[in-house]
C-alpha cells in the first residue's frame, strides 16, 4: 500500500495524527498571523485606492519572490537540526543553530542588495502610471530593508520548530500581526503626525514587523529553560564555511523549488499588467487568499519534516515512511474544507479586499479556479516537505521546474494571449501544473521512503 499506511494499527495512526497536530497547529496559527500580515497590507492598500492596491500587488510580488526563495534555502536547517536532535547530538544542535543565524544574516544582506538593484529595471520595464510606479518603488525599498531580519528570523524559526517548540513561534507571530495593524494604519493613512504614504506605508510596516519578530524570537529562545542544554545563545560562534556548504547543498534546491512555485504566481501579476489595473488587483486577491489557505499544507508539511527527520535520527526508518503517509492523508482531509470555502464563499471573500465592481467580478471567478487546485496543491506541498525530512531536495526541484514553468507559466501565457483566455488562461495552466507536480512528488516519496527502509533492512 502507498507509503505503508496499512503497516501499523489504527491506534498508531491516531497517535501520529496527534503528534502531527501538536506540531502543526501552533505552526498553522503562526502562519495565520504571518499571512495575515500580508492580508492586512492588501486590505489597507485597497482602502487607500485601486492604484495603491496595484502598486502593493507589484511590489509585494517582487519581495515575496526573493523572500520565499531565500526562506526555502533556510529551510535546510529543519531536517539538519531535527535529525541531530533525534540522534541525541545536543552540542551539534546548538552549533548548527548558530551557524544558521550567521548564514541567514549574510543571505538577508544579499537579498537586500538584490531588491535595491531590481527597483530601476522594474520601473523601466513596466508601463504604469507615475503614481503606481513611484509607490511600487517606495514599497520595494522599505521591504528590502527587512530582508536581513527576515532571514535571521527564519533561522530561529527553524531552530525552535525542529526542537518541537513551535509555540514560541506562534506567540511571536501573533505579536507581530497585532503590531502590523496599527503600523499600517499610521503609515498608509498618515496618522499621529506621519505623512500618508499610501501603499508604500505597507512596506514600511513590514520592515518594522520583521525586525521586531527576529529580536523577539531571539529573546524568547535565550530565556526559555528548555533551550539551555543546546547552548545556542551561551557562546559566540564564528562563521563555519563547512556548515554553510551543507546548508547550501540542502537548501539551494529547496529555495529554487520555492522560487519556481512562487514565480509562477508572482510573475503572472507582471504579465497581467497590460490587461489593466482591474486584472492586476483581482490577481492580488487570488494570490492573497490562496496564500492564506496554503499555510495549512505548509504547517502539516513542516510538522511532517520535523517528525520524519526526528525518526530518521533515531534510525526508525519504517516509522518515518509511515509518518509521510499520515501527513498526506491529513492534508487530503483538510483540503476538502478549503475547496468548499473558496467555491461557496468566493464573492464575499473577494469583497473583503476591494469594492470595485469590475475587480470583484474578476476576483470571484479567479477564486473558483483557486478552489479547484486545492487538493493537488496540498498534495504536492506536503510530499515535498516529507522528502525534505529525508534531505532529498534536488529531485523535487526538477519536478517543480518542469511542472510550474514547463506545464504552468509558459502554457498559461499561450492560453492568456494566444487563445484570448486572459487571466483565466494562467489559472487553468496552474491547475494542470500542480496536478503534475503532486503525482510526481508522491511517487518520488514512495520510492525514496521504501528504499530507505529496504537499505537498512528494517522489518
Name each model-derived stretch.
Residues 22-41, 142, 146, 176, ...:
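Transmembrane helical elements of multi-pass membrane transporters/channels
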Residues 2-5, 16-18, 22-35, 47-53:
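N-terminal alpha-helical transmembrane segments of multi-pass membrane transport
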Residues 32, 36-54, 123-130, 186-197, ...:
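Helix-terminus/linker motif at the lipid-water interface of multi-pass membrane proteins
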Residues 28, 32, 36, 40, ...:
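Generic alpha-helical transmembrane segments of integral inner-membrane proteins
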Residues 1-24, 81-148, 194-252, 308-373, ...:
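Short alpha-helical transmembrane segments in multi-pass integral membrane proteins
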Residues 22, 45-64, 131-135, 199-200, ...:
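Interfacial/gating helices of multi-pass transporter permease domains
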Residues 53-113, 150-164, 168-169, 283-346, ...:
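Small-residue-rich hydrophobic transmembrane alpha-helices
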Residues 74, 78, 143-161, 169-180, ...:
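Short runs within selected transmembrane alpha-helices of multi-pass transporters and secretion channels
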Amino acid at each position: 500500500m502507498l507509503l505503508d499506511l496499512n503497516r501499523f494499527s489504527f491506534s498508531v495512526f491516531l497517535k501520529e495524527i496527534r503528534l502531527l497536530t501538536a506540531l502543526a497547529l501552533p505552526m498553522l496559527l503562526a502562519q495565520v498571523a504571518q499571512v495575515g500580515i500580508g492580508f492586512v497590507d492588501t486590505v489597507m492598500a485597497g482602502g487607500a485606492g485601486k492604484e495603491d492596491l496595484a502598486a502593493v500587488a507589484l511590489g509585494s510580488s517582487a519581495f515575496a519572490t526573493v523572500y520565499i526563495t531565500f526562506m526555502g534555502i533556510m529551510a535546510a536547517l529543519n531536517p539538519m537540526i531535527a535529525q541531530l536532535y533525534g540522534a541525541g547530538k545536543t552540542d551539534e544542535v546548538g552549533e548548527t543553530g548558530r551557524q544558521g543565524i550567521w548564514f541567514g544574516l549574510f543571505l538577508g544582506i544579499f537579498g537586500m542588495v538584490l531588491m535595491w538593484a531590481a527597483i530601476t529595471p522594474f520601473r523601466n520595464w513596466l508601463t504604469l502610471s507615475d503614481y503606481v510606479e513611484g509607490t511600487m518603488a517606495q514599497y520595494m525599498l522599505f521591504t528590502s530593508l527587512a530582508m536581513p531580519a527576515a532571514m535571521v528570523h527564519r533561522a530561529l524559526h527553524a531552530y525552535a520548530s525542529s526542537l518541537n517548540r513551535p509555540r514560541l513561534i506562534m506567540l511571536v507571530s501573533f505579536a507581530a500581526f497585532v503590531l502590523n495593524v496599527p503600523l499600517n494604519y499610521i503609515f498608509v493613512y498618515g496618522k499621529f503626525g506621519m505623512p500618508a504614504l499610501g501603499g508604500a506605508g505597507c512596506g514600511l510596516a513590514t520592515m518594522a514587523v520583521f525586525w521586531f519578530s527576529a529580536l523577539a524570537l531571539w529573546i524568547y529562545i535565550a530565556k526559555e529553560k528548555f533551550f539551555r542544554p543546546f547552548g545556542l545563545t551561551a557562546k559566540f560562534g564564528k562563521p563555519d564555511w563547512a556548515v554553510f556548504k551543507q546548508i547550501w547543498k540542502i537548501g539551494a534546491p529547496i529555495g529554487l523549488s520555492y522560487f519556481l512555485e512562487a514565480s509562477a504566481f508572482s510573475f503572472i501579476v507582471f504579465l497581467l499588467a497590460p490587461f489593466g489595473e482591474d486584472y492586476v488587483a483581482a490577481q492580488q486577491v487570488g494570490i492573497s487568499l490562496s496564500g492564506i489557505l496554503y499555510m495549512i499544507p505548509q504547517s502539516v508539511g513542516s510538522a511532517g519534516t520535523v517528525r520524519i527527520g526526528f525518526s530518521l535520527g533515531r534510525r526508525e526508518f519504517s516509522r518515518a515512511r509511515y509518518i509521510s503517509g499520515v501527513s498526506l492523508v491529513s492534508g487530503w482531509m483538510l483540503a476538502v474544507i478549503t475547496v468548499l470555502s473558496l467555491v461557496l464563499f468566493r464573492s464575499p471573500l473577494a469583497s473583503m479586499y476591494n469594492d470595485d465592481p469590475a475587480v470583484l467580478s474578476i476576483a470571484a471567478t479567479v477564486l473558483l479556479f483557486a478552489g479547484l487546485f486545492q487538493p493537488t496543491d496540498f498534495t504536492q506541498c506536503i510530499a515535498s516537505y516529507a522528502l525534505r525530512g529525508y534531505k532529498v531536495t534536488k529531485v523535487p526541484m526538477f519536478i517543480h521546474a518542469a511542472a510550474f514553468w514547463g506545464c504552468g507559466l509558459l502554457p498559461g501565457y499561450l492560453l492568456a494571449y494566444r487563445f484570448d483566455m486572459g487571466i483565466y488562461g494562467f489559472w487553468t495552466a496552474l491547475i494542470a501544473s500542480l496536478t503534475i507536480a503532486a503525482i510526481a512528488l508522491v511517487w518520488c516519496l514512495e520510492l525514496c521512503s521504501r528504499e530507505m527502509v529496504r537499505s537498512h533492512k528494517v522489518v
